[in-house]
Amino acid sequence: MIIKRGDVYYAMLDPIIGSEQGGFRPVVIIQNDVGNRYSTTVIASVTTRKKKVYMPTHVPVKLRHDDFPHEFVVMLEQIRTIDKSRLLDYICTLSPAKMREIDRALAVSLGIKQCGKIDKFAKNA
């Protein structure tokens, strides 16, 4: 299986500890393609709950895909490393524009400055 940054898969995330996102759920691959080829992968969890409070670490996504909820939120505060054997079914690949949004939210989550500037949300995170 070739895993690429920006791919969305269903994954089995159990067992979990505490408030980690678990169960059979969609995830977005956020690790670079070289790392994906040679090691475990880094993912961000997804929620399809529409009542979830949006935070600067959340990226809403709308898709046109038959076998997947059409709207979901990528939660960049819920990142973790998983073995690729946890990835089950490929769903789709996000657009480069959507991945730039994910990069910004990830930078906020990790407190990373982008291009020498601090994102307005990162100042308060």
Residue ranges and their predicted role:
Residues 1-25, 29-125:
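Conserved functional hotspots at enzyme active or ligand-binding sites that engage polyanionic ligands
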